[in-house]
Amino acid sequence: MSESPSANISDADKSAITPTTGDTSQQDVKPSTEHINLKVVGQDNNEVFFKIKKTTEFSKLMKIYCARQGKSMNSLRFLVDGERIRPDQTPAELDMEDGDQIEAVLEQLGGCTHLCL
């Protein structure tokens, strides 16, 4: 699979997904409220762009992002405005808009400190 700046959600959704080119010269171009463009930013500032339906569960986006980054879904947390996203949520549920950003951060466990007396 070749790396590209944008990722599609699934093979089943390919018929409903159009590439983002920025070309608005066509006469029949109309704004789509069914799809939105989202940007996932990792801790290394790597950006991956997704165009998904507002009703698509984030689990699809998460799986594709993790596969591209070579990480397991259990090792990352996905955040919007500092709040964790659940895999069963959708962009519509979170009132997300075109161009919104999702942060992908490593899960941190532990935090126990030693108490010296």
From Swiss-Prot:
Assigned keywords, A-Z: Isopeptide bond, Nucleus, Ubl conjugation pathway
Crosslink site: Glycyl lysine isopeptide (Gly-Lys) (interchain with K-? in acceptor proteins): G111
Domain Ubiquitin-like: 35-115
Gene3D superfamilies, A to Z: Phosphatidylinositol 3-kinase Catalytic Subunit, Chain A, domain 1
Location within or outside the cell: Nucleus
GO molecular function: protein tag activity; ubiquitin-like protein ligase binding
Disulfide bond positions: none
PROSITE patterns linked: UBIQUITIN_2
One Gene Ontology cellular component annotation held by this UniProt entry: septin ring
Propeptide intervals in chain numbering: 112-117
Biological-process GO terms, alphabetical: mitotic recombination-dependent replication fork processing; protein sumoylation; stalled replication fork localization to nuclear periphery; telomere maintenance
Composition skew (Polar residues), residue ranges: 17-30
Region: Disordered, residue numbers: 1-37
Record Pfam families: Rad60-SLD (PF11976)
Self-association state and partner proteins as the record states: Interacts with rfp1.
Family affiliation: Belongs to the ubiquitin family. SUMO subfamily.
Described function: Required for chromosome segregation where it may be involved in microtubule assembly. Loss of smt3 leads to an increase in telomere length.
Protein name listed in UniProt: Ubiquitin-like protein pmt3/smt3
Protein source organism: Schizosaccharomyces pombe (strain 972 / ATCC 24843) (Fission yeast)
Gene: pmt3
